[in-house]
Amino acid sequence: MLAAPLPSFSTDAFDQVVMSTYGRFPITLVRGEGCRVWDDQGRSYLDFVAGIATCTLGHAHPALVETVSRQMQTLHHVSNLYYIPQQGALAQWLVAHSCGDRVFFCNSGAEANEAAIKLARKYAHTVRHIANPIIITAQASFHGRTLATITATGQPKYQKYFDPLVPGFAYVPYNDLGALEALVASLDQPQPQVAAILLEPLQGEGGVRPGDRAYFEQVRQLCTEKGILLIFDEVQVGMGRTGSLWGYETLGVEPDIFTSAKGLAGGVPIGAMIAKEFCAVFQPGDHASTFGGNPLATAAALTVCETLEKENLLENVRDRGQQLRTGLQELAAAYPQVIAEVRGWGLINGLELQPDTPLTAAEVVKAALAEGLLLVPAGPKVVRFVPPLIVSATEIDMALGAMSRALAHLAA
């Protein structure tokens, strides 16, 4: 494989010209293959970040490399004013493998959630005749960085300094049916105002907190009884990461609308909003995306979808996820003064630190980095493990070994 030419730059020069929106770790990654990446000094790392649950097939997967290379040589972008075969084929696959009927393509999870919010509002106005629709979301949720999606996000730290926020959102504790029922009853007086309930099947950025099956079943019943749309944000958990293709399948509850992005095209930018026919009320001019559904991104995504099936990756996710959780639970037993809980589904798992330990998730991530393992925080006290779905049993064992060494160093 030919290596891409590497621009010559220093991290100091980088920091002088790139806006400071990230707190970066002090390594420069230049190459990847499978579940490994290499820095500019030639050191390799086991990648359990995967671009934050994005590199579904790992790095430089032959099928994805071949598809993207071929598509770039053929046709990489045209306007949605024309029919795009790859887009149609991907939409067909998504509809055939989900509860949805119609697909809107965009470029990211935030854009997909924006599309879902707009669709829910239009449905509320045109079908239910709600003048001022309200969408309920969960506290500690995360739905994106645009103005509407940070408003939907139930974490004030993401909203600070961006007032005035978008009106029409309300918040309840996650997995708390009583609080949700009370809020709906309050908002729907004297007439209905609740247009939709937007939830993550598992809260990712909020600390890797799985949804409670009984709670979601009752939320589904509530929405059906009142005509409220149920929207699932599947951006981080969808495309096989939970061990099912979609997080809603893990819960056994179907939404009316759901969103996908991150892992859908294995690292090529894409987003999708999938809706059931009855609420797919968009008409020409209601919404659009210049790059959404372009031939390159949709060809890549279709290859990811087909590879999930061909390589039986859902079974691998379930097996390797159980192996990882078992190993993390053993580490929790060995370091009870540090680790409070291990939780997750499939290959999205969180290790929560004890509330009284001075250690932060960022410090644990830095210690793991020194041992050649890339991890990512999910809040101040939770370390997140989201490796590529192709991860092997040997690589899980190596990651657990690196974590053991990191914890031993921190506990010393």
UniProtKB/Swiss-Prot annotation:
Cofactor note: Binds 1 pyridoxal phosphate per subunit.
Sites where the protein binds pyridoxal 5'-phosphate: G109, A110, F142, D233, E234, V235, Q236, T290
N6-(pyridoxal phosphate)lysine PTM positions: K262
UniProt pathway annotation: Amino-acid biosynthesis; L-arginine biosynthesis; N(2)-acetyl-L-ornithine from L-glutamate: step 4/4
PROSITE patterns documented for this protein: AA_TRANSFER_CLASS_3
EC number in record: 2.6.1.11
Entry's Gene Ontology molecular function annotations: identical protein binding; N2-acetyl-L-ornithine:2-oxoglutarate 5-aminotransferase activity; pyridoxal phosphate binding
Domain of life: Bacteria
Signal peptide positions (record): none
InterPro entries from the UniProt entry: AcOrn/SuccOrn_fam, Aminotrans_3, Aminotrans_3_PPA_site, Class-III_PLP-dep_AT, PyrdxlP-dep_Trfase, PyrdxlP-dep_Trfase_major, PyrdxlP-dep_Trfase_small
Biological-process GO terms, alphabetical: L-arginine biosynthetic process
GO cellular component: cytoplasm
Flavoprotein found in the keyword field: no
Record: residues binding N(2)-acetyl-L-ornithine: R145, S289
Main subcellular location: cytoplasm
Cell inner membrane keyword on record: no
Pfam families: Aminotran_3 (PF00202)
Cofactors named for this entry: pyridoxal 5'-phosphate
Catalytically driven reaction(s): N(2)-acetyl-L-ornithine + 2-oxoglutarate = N-acetyl-L-glutamate 5-semialdehyde + L-glutamate
Record key words, sorted: Amino-acid biosynthesis, Aminotransferase, Arginine biosynthesis, Cytoplasm, Pyridoxal phosphate, Transferase
Cell location: Cytoplasm
Other comments on record: May also have succinyldiaminopimelate aminotransferase activity, thus carrying out the corresponding step in lysine biosynthesis.
Subunit structure: Homodimer.
Family assignment from sequence similarity: Belongs to the class-III pyridoxal-phosphate-dependent aminotransferase family. ArgD subfamily.
Name of this protein: Acetylornithine aminotransferase
Lineage of origin: Bacteria, Bacillati, Cyanobacteriota, Cyanophyceae, Acaryochloridales
Gene designation: argD
